[in-house]
UniProtKB/Swiss-Prot annotation:
Organism: Nautilia profundicola (strain ATCC BAA-1463 / DSM 18972 / AmH)
Protein name: Acyl carrier protein
GO CC terms, sorted: cytosol; membrane
GO biological processes: lipid A biosynthetic process
Encoding gene per record: acpP
Pathway assignment: Lipid metabolism; fatty acid biosynthesis
């Protein structure tokens, strides 16, 4: 499964949005309707799924689906 699809799966489950709404450029708050708690829970789910640690300082910079993908790719490199 491609990284985007794995990330998308977590986002759809955590934010309860339709899969077609999850695009690389989609912003979690503005486009997907997430609030700050939703974002925190989503970050925690992503950390668990990909076995990575996303520090708070980095989590604050993650605004879009692509930001998550970029971070995971760097963390796994």
């Amino acid at each position: 499964m491609a990284l985007f699809d794995e990330v998308k799966e977590v986002i759809v489950e955590q934010l309860n949005v339709a899969p077609e709404e999850v695009k690389p450029e989609a912003k979690f708050v503005e486009d997907l309707g997430a609030d700050s708690l939703d974002v925190v829970e989503m970050i925690m789910a992503l950390e668990e799924k990909f076995e990575i640690e996303i520090p708070d300082s980095e989590a604050e910079k993650i605004q879009t689906v692509q930001d998550v993908i970029d971070f995971i790719e760097k963390a796994k490199a």
